[in-house]
Amino acid sequence: MSFMLATIKTASGPRAAMVVGDRVLDIAAASGHAEDATMLHIMETWAETLPRLDALATKAATSGIPLSEAHLLAPILNPGGIFCAGSNYGDHAAEMAARSGQPAPPDPHTLGLRSWHFMKTRHCIIGPGATVTMQPRSKKIDWEIELALIIGKTARNVSEADALDYVAGYLIANDLSARDLGNREGLPATSSFKADWIAHKNWDGSCPLGPWITLARDIPNPHDLKMVLDVNGVVKQDSNSSHMIFNINEQIADLSRNFTLHPGDLILTGTPAGVGAGRGEFLNKGDVVRLRIDHLGELVNTMA
């Protein structure tokens, strides 16, 4: 029986849960394994825990609480790392280059380049339905729909051919960005102090995740998922994960050549065209941002 993994708010704190249809089951309470209370532990013991979860799924369908009554948090609250692919859709790379009057960059494969990533911290994570506090120093907060994946077993120097074997599941992410804080004013482009990726990509609430983790085995093809983001009901991004420059296999292989990926780590695989920076539009207080990806549900947050 298919199920999704979530983290819910309870009187005793955040608890890992499974979603089966319109029911939600506290995994640790149902399994009798207290350590199953956190999503990180479930990922760290994924191979051993998955059969137990499969056995619980039938129980979840007839017990637990209604999904409508569950308070969903971000599916994982404390990943060891959040690695975000930069400029990984050709149309997005082109729209960002056009901002400064530059031509669309060539496919980096033709230059012998590999994927590149920056990082967000877990302090930035919020869940579905949560309110995003605007970065007070920024007037140009932007949206970015991203297909995210969660690692389910330790990965080091893995091959592209085997890379998907290390993915436990997929979820939706919004890589919120403060476009006017990414480069420090008054400094030449060649200055070592020009770029500020922390201010650009990291503040409390800048990494909405959710609504849950859909298991990798339930995704027919992660490289063919429709992705749509709208702001106040107006579609801004409408694309497909098939348009990635560096696919998921390449990204996992590239990252694992540099360091060990651990269970619970997240990889955000890039955003397509349609971001606010390319339109000269940015988010305002009260805006409702809705993200949808095939098979993964929808992630909705309000700006404040």
Predicted regions mapped to residue ranges:
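Non-heme Fe(II) oxygenase catalytic core, chiefly the N-lobe of the double-stranded beta-helix
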Residues: 120-179
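Catalytic-pocket segment enriched in acidic/His residues
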Residues: 11-14, 51-54, 65-71, 75, ...
